[in-house]
Amino acid sequence: MAGRGFEEVRATFTTCLPKQHRDFLEALTVSAVIGDYFFCHAGVRPGVTLDRQRRDDLLNIREPFLSSEAEHGKLVVHGHTPAVAPELRPNRIGIDTAAFATGRLTCLVLEKDQQHFLPESYWTGQ
């Protein structure tokens, strides 16, 4: 697809994707609340309640979310912004360790009010 514009690629993909698959993807939610945790792809807009977050922010935000120390009502678990290691902050947990480029996938374990990460050796046996 070299030399093709994004819109052309998107149109081709949309045409080739079966309607059943497209309907499934369009029906997915962009966030979830489980207990004291709020899960989303990118993060939230500080100062906006979780139930009023915009789809675009949930999928694309970086700043001011990443530098914010504000409480969000729940502990936000997110990806979208790669880091060398998982980030555990009082108001958020960043789990994007660039698996697409590094091969290191982060596994966050949430047990009651405790959070920890499984070490790579858990998966590799090393």
Model segments located where?
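Acidic, His/Gly-enriched loop-helix segments that form or flank divalent-metal centers
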Residues: 1-94, 98-104, 110-125
